């Protein structure tokens, strides 16, 4: 696969998603390929007049019981749109995932891309959920909003195997009911902790109640994104709380701890993303803390 070409087209096509697009380089592409879950098949480059103008990555989820495929990196450089390139890339991706035995295909787009929405609907994709990019100014973080003060927070120790295994177990338990979640292996969890593709400064925290570990969250700083956007922003990662312990202020406690951690690192803002079909209603938690929606994305699904 021609990684330099892939990087060039991605950067040219994704500039419209400036709220989250940080750019990518060849070295980062190679790091992404080291992930145990990376699928090396299904990557296609579209050319017009021998010039690369578009991409698509037809990813077959290895651990999905539903045999679900995803259309990733589906993009065309703006000046080459409306010339049939997106239609051809979509056709190639769908056929690739059919060939690999997938029963369901998902693809996403920004709300402002009415042309992409129309294309997906013409291909019998149906809207299944929205994703929200949310942001908060760290000078406005509240307190006494229902956080559980009996919860003890402790950091994950990256060099302790037991902590990695605890995180893996918690992640799979907490996210079992979340749509699109596929169980993580120990290797995938270890790789995300030790070799995250862009959060070079990352911390993960466990929440314990009555000496039992019941939840976790993570925070990180993407230095490349901050330089590109000229901001001082951190990110709240996944927040997971075991089902029997939800609605007890533990998630609120974890979010507030994460925000205070980022503020202590001199960040001014924090970002998080979540979906409207999350059964834990995480978006309500973030709104309670003070996050505001920056941008929305639409995920469509096609059953084969």
Predicted regions and their residues:
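A conserved beta-turn-beta hairpin within the catalytic core of GNAT-like acetyltransferases
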Residues: 61-71, 81, 223-236, 246, ...
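Conserved acetyl-CoA-binding loop-helix of GNAT-fold acetyltransferases
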Residues: 76, 82-95, 122, 238-241, ...
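Extended hydrophobic-aromatic, low-complexity segments
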Residues: 178-179, 208, 215-217, 225-230, ...
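Active-site/acyl-donor-binding loops of N-acyltransferases
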Residues: 123-142, 256-260, 265-304
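Active-site rim helix/loop that mediates acceptor-substrate recognition in acyltransferases
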Residues: 10-14, 19-48, 55-61, 181-209, ...
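Acyl-donor-binding surface of acyltransferase catalytic domains
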Residues: 62, 77-151, 296-303
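A short beta-loop-alpha structural element at the N-terminal edge
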Residues: 1-8, 152-169
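Conserved beta-strand in the GNAT
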Residues: 43-45, 51-60, 70, 75, ...
């Amino acid at each position: 696969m021609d990684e330099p070409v892939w990087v060039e087209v991605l950067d040219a096509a994704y500039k419209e998603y400036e709220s989250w697009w940080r750019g990518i380089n060849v070295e980062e592409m190679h790091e992404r390929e080291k992930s145990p879950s990376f699928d090396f098949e299904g990557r296609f480059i579209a050319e017009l007049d021998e010039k690369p103008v578009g991409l698509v990555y037809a990813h077959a989820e290895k651990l999905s019981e539903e045999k679900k495929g995803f259309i990733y990196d589906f993009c065309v450089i703006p000046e080459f749109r409306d010339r049939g390139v997106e239609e051809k890339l979509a056709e190639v991706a769908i056929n690739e995932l059919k060939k690999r035995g997938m029963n369901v295909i998902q693809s996403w787009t920004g709300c402002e891309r009415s042309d992409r929405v129309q294309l997906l609907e013409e291909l019998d994709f149906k809207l299944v959920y929205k994703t929200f990019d949310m942001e908060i100014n760290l000078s406005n973080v509240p307190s006494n909003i229902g956080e559980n003060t009996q919860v003890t927070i402790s950091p994950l120790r990256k060099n302790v195997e037991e902590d990695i295994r605890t995180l893996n177990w918690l992640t799979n338990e907490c996210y079992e009911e979340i749509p699109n979640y596929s169980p993580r292996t120990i290797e995938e969890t270890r790789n995300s902790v030790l070799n995250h593709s862009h959060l070079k400064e990352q911390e993960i925290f466990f929440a314990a109640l009555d000496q039992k570990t019941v939840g976790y969250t993570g925070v990180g700083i993407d230095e490349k994104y901050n330089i590109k956007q000229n901001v001082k922003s951190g990110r709240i990662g996944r927040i997971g709380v075991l089902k029997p312990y939800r609605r007890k202020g533990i998630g609120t406690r974890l979010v507030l701890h994460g925000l205070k951690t980022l503020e202590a690192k001199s960040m001014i803002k924090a970002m998080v993303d979540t979906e409207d079909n999350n059964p834990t209603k995480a978006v309500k938690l973030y709104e309670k803390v003070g996050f505001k929606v920056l941008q929305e994305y639409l995920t469509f699904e096609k059953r084969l």
